[in-house]
Amino acid sequence: MRQQNAGSDDRSLLERIRRGDTEGAGELFERYAPALLRFTDRLLSDRASAEEVTQEVFVKVITRAHQYDGRAEVSSWLFAIAANACRDRRRRDRRAPIVPLEAVPEPPQKGEGIEARLLTRERRAAVREALDSLSDEQREALVLARYHGLPYSEIAAVLGISVGAVKTRIFRAVEALKARFHEGETTWNAAN
């Protein structure tokens, strides 16, 4: 029931945006910007690009609110716009490659040693690298399912594919990640 109320509330916000209500746009931004930023950051592996793309998503929402047809949840529509914007950004970046600056390390937790911080940073880098090794299609499906907890039916709506195709992409992504980490583990053990 709560899900249904959130959906109708999102639709009413979108209707307000269609009428030019900037407060409605602000409310939708506050509601979805954090999740969309996490999503775009996972897909792009570059925080600055992710922030730009997330802003672009909301500009598109404001200028294209009239194109929302109501067949999918507003959240699915937003994630679809974000996925398309990330694909466009990755295509553009492949033509003119840029090297993202490494993220500023998180401040150490009380009592945390340098070894623990380095290990955490290495693990994050390994996960990002592994996600980057997936195809765009696999990465999008996996990130929507595992990091954002969307059900397969909603992922299918976001990506414009069948539920079966979603399951296949996620299965193949997980298998590719398992193989990559197993390969890395073997290489790591051989080096020690």
PLM region spans:
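Short, charged helix-capping/linker segments at alpha-helix termini
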Residues: R2-Q4, R18-E27, L37-E56, V163, ...
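Internal acidic/polar
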Residues: A6-D10, A96-T120, R124
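A short, charge-rich alpha-helical start-of-domain segment used by transcription regulators
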Residues: L14-L37, I62, E129, R139
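Sigma70-family region 2
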Residues: R18-R19, S45, E56-E73, R92-D93
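Residues within the DNA-recognition helix of helix-turn-helix
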Residues: Y32, R169-A176
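Structural recognition of an alpha-helix C-terminal capping motif at a helix-to-coil junction
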Residues: E52-V59, A72-N84
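Arg/Lys-rich amphipathic alpha helix in sigma70-family domain 2
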Residues: T63-G70, A80-P100, T120, R172, ...
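Helix-turn-helix DNA-binding module
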Residues: A125-E140, L144-A165
